[in-house]
Amino acid sequence: MDKCDGCVELNKMHGGTKTSDYYYTTSLGARLDSMDYALCALKSKGPAAKFKKRLGAKAVKSFEREAFNAHGILKSNDATTYRAISARGNYLGQDRADGSYSSKELCREFSAPNEHSLQKLKRLGRYYKGKPRLVYKYPFAKEPATEVTVYCDTDFAGCSQTRRSTSGGCVMVGGAQVKHWSKTQSTIALSSGEAELVGIGSGCAQGLGMQSLAADMGWQLKLSVHSDATAAIGIAKRRGLGKIRHLHCTDLWIQERVRNGDLQLHKILGTDNPADMYTKYVDAGIMEKALRKQNLFFMEGRAKLAPDTMGLKEQK
């Protein structure tokens, strides 16, 4: 499209960062994620001109600047630096559960990082500087654990460019978190139920792996998987495909596992699901609530047994 057709509105998306916080819809309700089209709408005359006047020149210039930066591909040296730091952030994300999703998103832009990618990297760095220490709490138990508990969640079509969904979750044993993950689904789900089913499949696979590891160590643990997706839980508990034949058969092995009693599926409220932090950007309140449910806490200072690799003690 070269010109704007119809009245244009500015809407606020749920979550996201600066340049992805806004999207445009025409009078027909069609969603347009293209920055080029959005700028065309702002610069055109006619119905969009009234919108531009109502929005204000300052806001328009701010949006134009953000849109330009989003398309500003980094130079070779800057791109190499971006990849190196993002790779270290991804390595750190294995321990820092609060940065798992952000690190994953940074690594997705390795092929062609732009100014927007760099801003997200800086934002993650500022967050780690403000919250340098995340402590895993392993409570003392008089009796050994009897169950592996998995929390999983999916953000349907969370990526505005590819429309792919993000699945994430955590594994708990004895009230302590032992594993977490956040990954983009390899295929584009046709519905939220299908995306959530794939997410439940990932959670079940992680739980079965931990259950098998415990069995090798002589612990016979039950497996309990929690999700806030009613439709996906219904599909996983039923027998056969019915009217959902378009789903991949590779995702329906969960039905057999449920029938055999190898695992149990439970419904959990979305507000109580700690896996929400692994599928999208969340605010501080949701993040801290999810971390507390996983027995993770922020602390000040530096751990006594932490290696002094940068000579910080000598500087003091």
PLM feature segments, named:
Residues 24, 149-152, 225:
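Short hydrophobic beta-strand that contains or immediately precedes a catalytic carboxylate
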Residues 55-133, 269, 277-279:
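C-terminal reverse transcriptase regions that engage the nucleic-acid substrate
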Residues 104, 138-140, 179-182, 261-273:
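Acidic carboxylate-rich catalytic motifs and surrounding loops in phosphoryl-/glycosyl-chemistry enzymes
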Residues 126-154, 218-219:
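Structured nucleic-acid-interacting core domains from mobile-element enzymes and related host factors
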